[in-house]
C-alpha cells in the first residue's frame, strides 16, 4: 500500500499552524483546534513535532518529522519511507500516514527513551542485542549488497566545501583537523584493513544511539526508531556504532565506551539470538566466536567514528540547527585517531 503524498511544506518556524492545515487529510476525525503539540528537542538532523487530541493518550500521538536543511544531499528520503513500509508489517517500525514536500507523518512508539545510563543496564542491553539480531535477519532488497558506510563517506567528501565560508569554522578546521585529501587517504586505508575481516553484510540500522532506542516496560521489550540511515552494512559496524553511542551526543564522554565484559555479554546475547533465527539446534556461541566478533566490532568502531566525523563536517556547512557540528566532527575524528592503534592491534587467536 502506497503512502499518500500531500503537496504541502511544513513550516519549521511555525510547525503547529502548518500541521493544523493538513491534519484532516491525515486523520479526518481530528479537530485541528483541539490538538496539543509538543516538540522533541533531542534530534540534531531534523525537527520533530508531536500532536494528539487534547488530553489524549500516548497511543494517539502523531509525529511530524521536518527534514533538516539540505539533508536530502546525503539521505535518500524515498528509500527511508520504503524502509518504513518494509519494517512496519514486521512490527519493527510505526506506520507512515503521509509524506510532505519536506517531511512525513508517522506513528509513535510508546515507551521510555534510553540514555547513556539506562542503555548499560544488563537486562536492557540484552534486549537491545536480541533486537539488533532481529533487524539483521531482515532480508535485504539488494541482490549484491555492499557496505554503505564507505560509500557514504566518499559522498560526504564530495559535498564538503573546500573551504568553510565562515572564517571561524575554517580556522578551527585547519587548526585541529587534517586536510580533506589526508582524511580521504586515511579512510581508504581503513577500508582496506576492515575488508579483510569479511564481516557479513546485513540490513543495518546504522544510527543506534541511545535516543533511538525505546524501552516499553509493560511489554519488557525494546524497539528502535528513526531509520533514515538504514542501509546494508557489516554486522560488526552496526554493533560498533551502537557501542560508540554510549558516549552520548550533546555532552560526549568516551570514557562511557563499554568495557570488554559488557561487550562480551551483549555479543553473546546477539549471537544466541542470531543462531535461534537461523534455526540452529545449539544456540550457545563458543568463546572463540564471541571473541572474533568482539575484535571485529572494535575495529569497525573506527569506521563509525570516521563516518560521523565526516558527517559532522557536512552538517557544519549545511545545517541550520543550533548545534556545534564542527566540534562534534572534531571529537569523533579525534576519537578515531586515539583508538586507532589499539583497536587495529586486536587479534583473535
UniProtKB/Swiss-Prot annotation:
Subcellular location as annotated: Cytoplasm
Alphabetical GO biological process terms: phosphatidylethanolamine biosynthetic process
Protein's UniProt keywords contain NADP: no
Gene Ontology MF term list: ATP binding; ethanolamine kinase activity
Entry keywords, A to Z: ATP-binding, Cytoplasm, Kinase, Lipid biosynthesis, Lipid metabolism, Nucleotide-binding, Phospholipid biosynthesis, Phospholipid metabolism, Transferase
Chain's role: Highly specific for ethanolamine phosphorylation. May be a rate-controlling step in phosphatidylethanolamine biosynthesis.
Protein name per UniProt: Probable ethanolamine kinase
Classification of source organism: Eukaryota, Metazoa, Cnidaria, Anthozoa, Hexacorallia
